[in-house]
């Protein structure tokens, strides 16, 4: 039976209802041991966001904005929930030795207490000899001190959570990683406007001749390189227009058309792994790592990911040629085209080149890639290379999507939700191989059905919590698990909905879902093996 509300499909309607229920149940109806009230609120927001991102009753970027709105409303110090909240505390009476007298309502259902010491809340669990008499309770504990106060309502909304200013949540919209992405988007817009992308592509394809296997390799290399510094979505859209004249030379029903069409999104997804700005999961992982105080420069990231990208590109090239064999010996390629020489085009070339050079040499000059990204933002506008109409066409919704992901990860960490979610799993018993395999498989699996940005948002806080808990000792630590998550998210290529490049390629009408699934599944399996090998061998060597 089909049903819908507000013009939504059945799937979207169910997603809307289940998402709202997921938002309300944890803070209103649940009392999960070890999770603060703020953690319950965040769990509700997490469930709503995950369900909305999966079923899309509203656009995925709108879900991200809803996340920030709910955080400001329900978790900020200025919101109605915490604006006037004060912890109910009372003094602790010292009886003798390590014996204390407290109100009985201060005891939790698990016979522990929350105390306030130096304006911080602490959970005391080592209670002994608990005796309840009328309106008092006697307890023994070596962890309680003379000046401590006890919280008389263990379920109070401020227990184990100190609300932060709403500015912290709004600030994610201007997070340095967002600025980094905005700079990349503006460079991409300039490249398209002044035909730098198409002319550069034609120029770079010349060395590959006219044989099909080398043309495919050339297309994939050019796509991967552009995708490393531009949006992989924009790169795919541009490169699909480049290959259409090539595909037109093939006869109807020729399966090599499928291989050519798949080579672009697959190369874009793989190329995006190379740099921090290549794809949103990289930005989310990098932001999460930097928030812990660890630094990974632009060059560092490329050192980690270059072997993965090179091996994956060669593997994808070989797979596509084997599965969709060429039926033509040579292509007739039109390589005509000149670089524009107008003053604004020359300014674009200069800004593009300097920006990429500064990004690559970050370790040498010490200027953050986030700061460098503001050079094209200011330079392209100030010189008139991009005008207000160009700015309006930028993919702002992607920035909003990433900002919501960063903000959700912030609350999952601050409220203890991320740590609570993994506390019941003995991750330490899994071993290095099992940890890498589990995180990689989860990231690839989720990214095939959710956006890879959403997947990185959901999985990365778990990796940080494991690192914080000491389960990921160096050199197999935070950076390694972050790389596993970000790289694995980009290996999801089975379905048209898995990534925007896949969807763009599907829109040409050349591909069918089974064709994409066949190639994507093989590449995903090989990619996971490559990720595991790098995580266990290559990355630890670099980190050492």
Q: What residues fall within each predicted segment?
A:
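Transmembrane alpha-helix interface/packing and boundary motifs in multi-pass membrane proteins
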Residues: 51-58, 189, 222-232, 265-277, ...
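Generic alpha-helical transmembrane segments of integral inner-membrane proteins
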Residues: 17, 21, 47-51, 69, ...
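Juxtamembrane and boundary regions of transmembrane helices in multi-pass small-molecule transporters
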Residues: 1-30, 34, 187, 193, ...
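Interfacial loop-to-helix junctions that mark the boundaries of transmembrane helices
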Residues: 6-10, 32-40, 52-57, 163-176, ...
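Structural signature of hydrophobic alpha-helical transmembrane segments
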Residues: 34-43, 173-186, 232-236, 306-312, ...
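Membrane-embedded alpha-helical segments and adjacent helix-loop junctions characteristic
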Residues: 3-4, 31, 62, 66, ...
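Flexible hinge motifs at transmembrane-helix junctions and intramembrane kinks/re-entrant loops
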Residues: 33-36, 48-66, 72-79, 169, ...
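Hydrophobic alpha-helical transmembrane segments
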Residues: 13, 17, 42-43, 61-65, ...
